[in-house]
Amino acid sequence: MRRTTFVGLVPLLLLLVTGEATAHAFLDHAEPRVGNKVDAAPREVTLWFTQKLEPAFSTIAVTNAAGQRIDTGKARVSGNQMSVSVRPGGTGTYRVNWHVLSVDTHTTDGDFTFQVGQ
């Protein structure tokens, strides 16, 4: 009876372990928040992901309403967090584009917008 119980648990344990190992880094939340309206342009955009990131292969680009890139350069990555400094870009819709490589070697990307001063 004990052998049957153990054999029955093995597939369940494998499913749990491989489910975590194959997870990708998806956007968990951001500051400024996705779709939010803020009074003034932020000095920094920060994204948090569901997995740790590989710094050398993870990027953020921030553009203002005129489509001009206003981030100041390379993203800073620490664990599952990525941020970039932003120059003032006026009012309107800002777009954040991101591309990340998680430590599980899978890439994900996406974008979102937020409003400044409208």
Which residues are covered by each model-predicted region?
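Extended, polar beta-sheet/loop recognition surfaces of beta-rich domains
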Residues: V38-A40, E44-L47, T105-Q118
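Bacterial N-terminal signal peptides that target proteins for export
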Residues: M1-G8
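N-terminal signal peptide c-region/cleavage motif recognized by signal peptidases
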Residues: T18-E20
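Short, exposed beta-strand-loop hairpins at the edges of beta-sheets
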Residues: V86, N97-D111
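Surface-exposed, short loops/turns at beta-strand junctions within beta-sandwich domains
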Residues: R87-T93
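Short, surface-exposed alpha-helix to beta-strand junction/turn motifs within ectodomains of secreted
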Residues: V45-L47, Q51-I70
